[in-house]
UniProtKB/Swiss-Prot annotation:
Record text on subunit structure and interactions: Homodimer. The RNAP catalytic core consists of 2 alpha, 1 beta, 1 beta' and 1 omega subunit. When a sigma factor is associated with the core the holoenzyme is formed, which can initiate transcription.
Protein name from the UniProt record: DNA-directed RNA polymerase subunit alpha
Domain note: The N-terminal domain is essential for RNAP assembly and basal transcription, whereas the C-terminal domain is involved in interaction with transcriptional regulators and with upstream promoter elements.
EC class of the enzyme, as a word: transferase
Stretches the record annotates as Alpha N-terminal domain (alpha-NTD): 1-235
Source organism per UniProt: Haemophilus ducreyi (strain 35000HP / ATCC 700724)
Residues covered by region (Alpha C-terminal domain (alpha-CTD)): 249-329
Length: 329
């Protein structure tokens, strides 16, 4: 009897009511009191903000330099055209970004079905209206750049990350990557045998058609479970101590002596003695350097002062010098 008091009930999927191909209601019960709101709110937030999908991110329209303009023969202004393009439901297989083209002329509506694309792309809502052409000689030509992402990313958040040489006329669009259009949940009372203090979770959601509602909930639950994995066993959360690999030699020792900016006379004397790197130089003693032809006390003093300004001195001993990278050269 004690076990039944402390053990949690394990919920199960009771019903999936498929209202349409993009609209479904999912019922989950029984849940311990309070868990309906706990799980419902978590799943709702993930479904709205963290689901991956594809969306229109940029658009180029022939004859249009900026979004605050209009195009002759097009009923809508450019801002409205961009707003309509945001409603395009695109499904892309195997790629992170694709370019679609749209070329239409003559009087009538311009639909998503008029977009040209390859076999990796599927337009879910082909009857979606993009704009209307009002003249028989009117035409519209555009390149639509679709990217894969997550959640909602406004155009303003991507401006700083774009190249400065962005072509004039390439318009940024607020990208709504999430395939979930609407999500709501309701918690009702549930009963199991004599217990009446239980919850029933009902999730009501609509998608843009690029993902099945049931699959969307399954993915959201997977994301939530993966995020909670770190808490499953707190004894294992300690990270192994990572020992930083210190370089065998101070990087300054691997630099050429030319970096010391010595006088031409001193530099030539060192090169004549095959002293090419600072690591070669610091291992020489004052006596050894004074034996170098044409290198006098003035040059020696200059070398000592330059080394001292870098925290080095003559007569140093370096184990395993030269390193393999220099020896190979």
């Amino acid at each position: 009897m004690q076990g039944s008091v402390i053990e949690f009930l394990k919920p199960h999927l009771v019903n999936i009511e498929q209202i349409s191909s993009t609209h479904a209601k999912v019922t989950l019960e029984p849940l311990e009191r309070g868990f309906g709101h706990t799980l419902g709110n978590a799943l709702r937030r993930i479904l709205l903000s963290s689901m991956p999908g594809c969306a229109v991110a940029e658009v180029e329209i022939d004859g249009v330099l900026h979004e605050y303009s209009s195009k002759e023969g097009v009923q809508e202004d450019i801002l409205e055209v961009l707003l309509n393009l945001k409603g395009l439901a695109v499904k892309v297989s195997g790629k992170n970004d694709v370019t679609l083209t749209l070329n239409k002329s003559g009087i009538g509506p311009v639909l998503a079905a008029d977009i040209t694309h390859d076999g990796d792309v599927e337009i879910i809502n082909p009857n979606h209206v993009i704009c209307h052409l009002t003249d028989k000689d009117a035409s519209i030509n555009m390149r639509i750049y679709v990217q894969r992402g997550r959640g909602y990313v406004p155009a303003s958040a991507r401006v700083h990350s774009q190249d400065e040489d962005r072509p004039i006329g390439r318009l940024l669009v607020d990208a709504r990557f999430s395939p979930v259009d609407r999500i709501a949940y309701n918690v009702e009372a549930a009963r199991v045998e004599q217990r009446t203090d239980l919850d029933k979770l009902i999730i009501d959601m609509e998608t843009n058609g690029t993902i099945d509602p049931e699959e969307a909930i399954r993915r959201a639950a997977t994301i939530l479970a993966e995020q909670l994995d770190a808490f499953v066993d707190l004894r294992d959360v300690r990270q192994p101590e990572i020992k930083e690999e210190k370089p065998e030699f101070d990087p300054i020792l691997l630099r050429p002596v030319d970096d010391l900016e010595l006088t031409v006379r001193s530099a030539n004397c060192l090169k004549a003695e095959t002293i090419h790197y600072i690591g070669d130089l610091v291992q020489r003693t004052e006596v050894e350097l004074l034996k170098t032809p044409n290198l006098g006390k003035k040059s020696l003093t200059e070398i000592k002062d330059v080394l001292a300004s870098r925290g080095l001195s003559l007569g140093m001993r370096l184990e395993n010098w030269p390193p393999a990278s220099i020896a190979e050269d």
